[in-house]
Curated annotation (Swiss-Prot):
Name of the featured protein: Translation initiation factor IF-2
Keywords recorded for this protein, A-Z: Cytoplasm, GTP-binding, Initiation factor, Nucleotide-binding, Protein biosynthesis
Gene Ontology MF term list: GTP binding; GTPase activity; guanosine tetraphosphate binding; translation initiation factor activity
Ranges of compositional bias, category Polar residues: 78-87
The keyword Protein biosynthesis is assigned to this record: yes
UniProt organism field: Cupriavidus metallidurans (strain ATCC 43123 / DSM 2839 / NBRC 102507 / CH34) (Ralstonia metallidurans)
Region (G5): 624-626
Domain tr-type G: 479-646
Length: 979
C-alpha cells in the first residue's frame, strides 16, 4: 500500500497543509510536519471527526446507494369478448447497497484472516439467495399487477367516469403497498448488514469479552425482530388494499345496478301512454273533491292544519316514499304512475313526478332532486323558471369590422340571419345571407335591432410597420438635398426654366410642349445638390400637383410676367399652403416687352403670397429661361430656404419614399419612379408600395443609367414590382419578402372588400336615381395610358364631362399597351378604347377591326377631352325649335260628307305647306294645335301656297272651323345641342 504524506493529502483536498494539520491534531492524530506519513486509519479517524463535527452519527457514516431498474414488456391477453389486446407491463427492481466500514486488523494471525474470508463468502451467498428470492417475488407481483391493470382498463372502458375514481383509489393503495415494500426491503437490508457486521466482528475479535459477543447477538436479534415486524406490516397493508379494492368493486356494482334501474324507470315512463290534459275548471273540481273525500293514504285534513301540512309536505313525502320503496312497493319505485300530468303540475312541491333510486321528491324539477340533492329546496322554483321567457331584451355590444357578411353579423348579434334580412328589407335593401355589408350599413342595422354597435379594430399586419419604423429611429441624421417642386399655370415656362438649369431639352420631348408627367431630376450645382420635381400645369393634373406638393420641401411658383395669376396658379398656392412648405416665386418671361412684374406681385399679394420687400416671407425672383437672367439668384434663394429648414434624414437605414410615377412596360414589366425620402435604397431590397411588392431587380437614375443605390432626396426608377403601384403610394423597404407579400395581400383584400360593399350599398340609390331621371345616355370608355398619373388625370377629366343626360362610364382604366383582352372587354361592353401615349399590338388591332371596335389614340390630354365632349354632344337629344312660316285667314267653311269641314282660306302672309303644323286662333286665342290633313287649290293637291293666293284645307281631327278664324302655320326644326 503506497504511503501518503500530509502535504500530498492536502493537495488532493485542495487545502493548505497547515489547515489539514490542525484538523488532524483536533481528531487526535499526532502529526507535526507536512512530511509525516498518514495511514488509512488516520484518514478514517479524521473522517469520523469531521462527520461528528458536522452533526452526523456513526450510523450515517455508512453510505447507502439505492439502484432502481425498470423493464418494460408486453403481454397479450384475451378479454371477455374474445378480443386479444396488448398490455404494457413495467417491472421495477430496487437494490440497496451499503458500504461497510473498513475492518481494522488487530493481529497478524492467518487463522483470523481465513475465517474472515470464509464468513464474507457465506454472507455473499446468503445475500445472493435473498436477492434471487426478492426478484422472484417482484416478478410475481409485477405479473399480478399487470393482470390487475388489464382488468382495470376493461372496467374503465365500460364506465369511464367511475373508473377515474377507482383508479385514483387503486393508485393510492399501490403507493401504500409499494412504500411498505420499500420500507421492508430497507429494514431487511439494514438487518442483514447489522447481522453480517456482528458476525464479522465476532469472528475477528474472538479474544474480546463475552459481553461484546452478547451485545452483537442482541443487535442481531433486534434486527431480525424489525424484519419480522416490517413483513407483518407489509402483509397487513396488502390485506387492507385487497379489502379496499373489494369495497370499490362492490360500490361500483351497486352504482351500475342503480343506474340500470334508473334507465329502466325512464324507459317505462317513455313507453307509458300519454295522459289527457284536463281543463283548469275540471282540475279544480277534482282537487276540491279530493280535499273533501280524502283517501286511505291522504285523509281529509282540518282547515287549520292545511298551511302547516303544506310547509311540512316537502319533507314528509320523501321520507314516506323512501320507506315504501324500501319495503318493495312498486308504486314508490315508479313515482305514482296512476296520477295525471295536471296532478303533478298542480301538486307542485308535493312529490309528483318520476321517482328513481328511492327518491320520492321528484317535484316539478329534476328527477334526482330530493332529500339527498344539494338543491332540493329550490327545485320547483327552478323548474317553473324554465318556462318563462326573459322579460327584458338582451342588449349586446357588437364590434363591426369594415366589411361583414349578413350571416356573420347575425352570429355576432346571436339572432337568425333571416331577422337581419328582414331588417334590411325594412330599410329598403334586398340582401342575401352571404352578401357583404360595409361598416356603416352594418352599424345602422345593429342599432335598428336594439344593440350597441362599435367599429372594430382590424388585426392589421400594417401595425407591424410602425414598430419596424421605430426600430431605426436611432440612426444618425445627416443633411440631405432639398426636394423642390416647380408648379404653376400651363405654358408659364416651368419646364423651360428647369431645362435651362439642367442644360437639356426636356420641353421638346413633351407632346404639344406641355408637361404631362411628373419629371424628377436631381441637379448638382456649385452650391449643392437640388432635386427638382416638374409637375404639369394643365387643369386635368390636379392630383399630380397635390402629390408633388406632398413630397416636396420647397415650392417654386412659376408665374409668367405677361400673363399674371391664373386658375392653376391659385391651385398651386393652395397645394403649397396645405403641405406647409415655403414658396419661392419665379416671375418668368421678364424679357418680353409686355412683361409687367409689378402687376404679378399685386395679384399674388391678393392670394396671400407676400414678397419679402413688402414684409412677407416669399422671395420674388424675376427670371428668363431664354437669357438665363435671375437663374443664379433663384438657386441661391432655394438653397437659403433649405438651410433654414435644416433638412436631415438617416442614411444607414432601410429606405422610405414616395411613388412619383408608375407605368407598365411591355418588356420590363411594372416600372415605378420613386423619390427616396430617408434611408438608402439598394438593388436587391424588398420594397412594398401600396398593394404592390417585389424585389428591386434593376435601378436607373433619371438619365437611364444603372445605379446600385440611392440616398435621401434622390429620384430613381425601379423594376421588379408585382404590379403597377398607384402614384402617391408610400414605399417601404422590408426585411423579407414573406412579410411584404402578407401586407400586400391584406391591402388588396381590404380594398376589394370595401369597394364591393360600397358598390352593393349604392346599387339601390343608383337605381332610384335612374328611375327618377328617366333614360340616361351612357358613353362607355376604356382608358389605357402610359403612366399611372396620366391615366388617373384623364379618367378624372372625362368623368367631369358627365351631365344629367349623358354619362361617361369608365369601364376599365389601366397602364400599358392595348391588348386583346381590352378589345374583348370593349366588345362585351360596347365601349370605345382611348389610348393615351400607347398603341395596340397587331393582335388587338386585328380583333378590333373584326369586331368593329373604335380605338382612338391621343398624346395631348385636352385633345382627348375635346373629342369625347364632341361625341357626348352628338348623343344629346336635339333641340326642337319652332319657325312661323305663314298666316292664313278662313273666308268660308264647306261641309263635305265623309270628309268633314273644309276651310276656304286666303294666305295673308308667308306661305303654307302641305303637312305643316297649324294653330287655330279664334279671337287671338289658341283653340287647337295640330297638323294639316290636305291642301288643295282648284281641286288639285299642291305642295305649298304662297301669299296672296286662295286655297282649301282641312285639319286633322278638328272640324270646328269657323269663318274669321286665323291659322298660324309653323314648322319644327331640330338643332344639335352642345355641352
Amino acid at each position: 500500500m503506497a504511503s501518503t504524506t500530509v502535504a500530498q493529502l492536502a493537495a488532493e483536498l485542495s487545502r493548505s497543509p497547515a489547515a489539514l494539520l490542525e484538523q488532524l491534531q483536533a481528531a487526535g492524530v499526532g502529526k507535526a510536519t507536512p512530511d509525516d506519513v498518514i495511514t488509512e486509519s488516520d484518514k478514517t479517524r479524521l473522517l469520523d471527526y469531521l462527520k461528528r463535527s458536522h452533526g452526523q452519527s456513526d450510523d450515517s457514516a455508512r453510505k447507502k446507494i439505492t439502484l432502481t431498474k425498470r423493464e418494460t414488456s408486453e403481454i397479450r391477453q384475451s378479454d371477455s369478448t374474445g378480443k386479444t389486446r396488448t398490455v404494457q407491463v413495467e417491472v421495477r427492481k430496487k437494490r440497496v447497497l451499503i458500504k461497510r466500514d473498513d475492518v481494522e486488523s488487530h493481529g497478524d494471525g492467518a487463522d483470523s484472516q481465513e475465517s474472515a474470508e470464509a464468513a464474507a463468502e457465506e454472507v455473499r451467498r446468503d445475500e445472493e439467495q435473498r436477492r434471487e428470492q426478492a426478484e422472484a417475488l417482484a416478478r410475481q407481483e409485477a405479473e399480478a399487477q399487470a393482470a390487475r391493470e388489464a382488468a382495470e382498463r376493461e372496467e374503465a372502458e365500460r364506465r369511464a367516469k367511475q373508473e377515474a375514481l377507482e383508479a385514483e383509489q387503486r393508485r393510492q393503495a399501490e403507493l401504500l403497498a409499494q412504500k411498505a415494500a420499500e420500507e421492508a426491503a430497507a429494514a431487511q437490508a439494514a438487518a442483514d448488514a447489522a447481522e453480517e457486521t456482528a458476525r464479522e466482528k465476532a469472528e475477528e475479535d474472538k479474544a474480546r469479552l463475552a459481553t461484546e459477543r452478547a451485545q452483537a447477538q442482541k443487535n442481531a436479534d433486534d434486527a431480525k425482530a424489525a424484519v419480522d415486524k416490517a413483513r407483518a406490516e407489509q402483509d397487513s397493508a396488502k390485506a387492507a388494499a385487497d379489502k379496499a379494492r373489494a369495497e370499490q368493486d362492490a360500490a361500483a356494482r351497486r352504482r351500475r345496478e342503480a343506474a340500470e334501474a334508473e334507465a329502466r324507470a325512464i324507459q317505462q315512463m317513455l313507453n307509458a301512454p300519454p295522459r289527457v290534459l284536463k281543463a283548469p275548471s275540471e282540475r279544480k273540481a277534482e282537487e276540491k273533491k279530493a280535499e273533501q273525500t280524502g283517501t286511505l293514504h291522504k285523509p281529509v285534513k282540518p282547515a287549520g292544519a292545511t298551511t302547516e301540512a303544506k310547509k311540512d309536505d316537502k319533507k314528509a313525502a320523501p321520507a314516506a316514499t323512501t320507506t315504501t320503496a324500501a319495503a318493495g312497493d312498486k308504486k314508490g319505485a315508479k313515482g305514482g304512475k296512476t296520477g295525471t300530468w295536471q296532478d303533478e303540475g298542480s301538486r307542485g312541491k308535493k312529490g309528483g313526478g318520476l321517482k328513481t333510486r328511492g327518491d320520492s321528491s321528484g317535484g316539478v324539477g329534476g328527477w334526482r332532486s330530493g332529500p339527498r340533492g344539494r338543491g332540493g329546496k329550490h327545485n320547483a322554483d327552478d323548474a317553473r323558471s324554465n318556462f318563462q321567457a326573459p322579460t327584458e331584451p338582451v342588449v349586446r355590444e357588437v364590434h363591426v369590422p369594415e366589411t361583414v357578411s349578413v350571416a356573420d353579423l347575425a352570429h355576432k348579434m346571436a339572432v337568425k340571419a333571416s331577422e337581419v334580412i328582414k331588417q334590411m328589407m325594412k330599410l329598403g335593401q334586398m340582401v342575401t345571407i352571404n352578401q357583404v355589408l360595409d361598416q356603416e350599413t352594418a352599424m345602422i342595422v345593429v342599432e335598428e335591432m336594439g344593440h350597441k354597435a362599435f367599429a372594430a379594430k382590424l388585426d392589421d399586419p400594417e401595425a407591424l410597420l410602425v414598430v419596424d419604423g421605430e426600430d431605426h429611429g436611432d440612426a444618425e441624421m445627416l443633411p440631405r438635398p432639398p426636394v423642390v417642386t416647380v408648379m404653376g399655370h400651363v405654358d408659364h415656362g416651368k419646364t423651360s426654366l428647369l431645362d435651362y438649369i439642367r442644360r437639356t431639352k426636356v420641353a421638346a420631348g413633351e407632346a404639344g410642349g406641355i408637361t404631362q408627367h411628373i419629371g424628377a431630376y436631381h441637379v448638382e450645382t456649385d452650391r449643392g445638390v437640388i432635386t427638382f420635381l416638374d409637375t404639369p400645369g394643365h387643369e386635368a393634373f390636379t392630383a399630380m400637383r397635390a402629390r408633388g406638393a406632398k413630397a416636396t420641401d420647397i415650392v417654386i411658383l412659376v408665374v409668367a410676367a405677361d400673363d399674371g395669376v391664373m386658375p392653376q396658379t391659385k391651385e398651386a398656392i393652395a397645394h403649397a399652403k396645405a403641405a406647409g412648405v415655403p414658396i419661392v416665386v419665379a416671375i418668368t418671361k421678364v424679357d418680353k416687352p409686355e412683361a409687367n412684374p409689378d402687376r404679378v406681385k399685386q395679384e399674388l399679394v391678393a392670394e396671400q403670397v407676400v414678397p419679402e420687400e413688402y414684409g412677407g416671407e416669399s422671395p420674388f425672383v424675376p427670371v428668363s429661361a431664354k437669357t438665363g437672367q435671375g437663374i443664379d439668384d433663384l438657386l441661391e434663394n432655394v438653397l437659403l430656404q433649405a438651410e433654414v429648414l435644416e433638412l436631415r434624414a438617416p442614411v444607414d437605414a432601410p429606405a422610405k419614399g414616395l411613388v412619383v410615377e408608375a407605368q407598365l412596360d411591355k418588356g420590363k414589366g411594372p416600372i415605378a419612379t420613386i423619390l427616396v425620402s430617408s434611408g438608402t435604397l439598394k438593388r436587391g431590397d424588398v420594397v412594398l408600395a401600396g398593394s404592390a411588392y417585389g424585389r428591386v431587380r434593376a435601378m436607373l437614375d433619371e438619365n437611364g443609367k444603372p445605379s446600385k443605390e440611392a440616398g435621401p432626396s434622390i429620384p430613381v426608377e425601379i423594376q421588379g414590382l408585382s404590379e403597377v403601384p398607384a402614384a402617391g403610394e408610400e414605399v417601404l423597404v422590408l426585411p423579407d419578402e414573406r412579410k411584404a407579400r402578407e401586407i400586400a395581400l391584406f391591402r388588396q383584400g381590404k380594398f376589394r372588400d370595401v369597394k364591393l360593399a360600397k358598390q352593393q350599398a349604392a346599387k339601390l340609390e343608383t337605381m332610384l336615381e335612374q328611375m327618377a331621371e328617366g333614360e340616361v345616355q351612357t358613353l362607355p370608355l376604356i382608358v389605357k395610358a402610359d403612366v399611372q398619373g396620366s391615366q388617373e388625370a384623364l379618367v378624372q377629366s372625362l368623368q367631369k364631362l358627365s351631365t344629367s343626360e349623358v354619362r361617361v362610364q369608365i369601364v376599365h382604366g389601366g397602364v400599358g399597351g392595348i391588348s386583346e383582352s381590352d378589345v374583348n372587354l370593349a366588345t362585351a361592353s360596347k365601349a370605345v378604347i382611348i389610348g393615351f401615349n400607347v398603341r395596340a399590338d397587331a393582335g388587338a388591332r386585328k380583333l378590333a377591326e373584326h369586331n368593329g371596335i373604335d380605338i382612338r389614340y391621343y398624346n395631348i390630354i385636352y385633345d382627348a377631352v375635346d373629342e369625347i365632349k364632341a361625341a357626348m354632344s352628338g348623343m344629346l337629344a336635339p333641340e326642337k325649335r319652332e319657325t312661323t312660316i305663314g298666316q292664313v285667314e278662313v273666308r268660308q267653311v264647306f261641309r263635305v260628307p265623309k270628309v268633314g269641314a273644309v276651310a276656304g282660306c286666303m294666305v295673308t302672309d308667308g306661305l303654307i305647306k302641305r303637312n305643316s303644323m297649324v294653330r287655330v286662333l279664334r279671337n287671338n286665342v289658341v283653340i287647337h294645335d295640330g297638323e294639316l290633313d290636305s291642301l288643295k287649290r282648284f281641286k288639285d293637291d299642291v305642295k305649298e301656297v304662297k301669299q296672296g293666293f286662295e286655297c282649301g284645307l282641312s285639319i286633322k281631327n278638328f272640324n270646328d272651323v269657323q269663318e274669321g278664324d286665323q291659322l298660324e302655320v309653323y314648322e319644327i326644326t331640330e338643332v344639335a345641342r352642345t355641352l
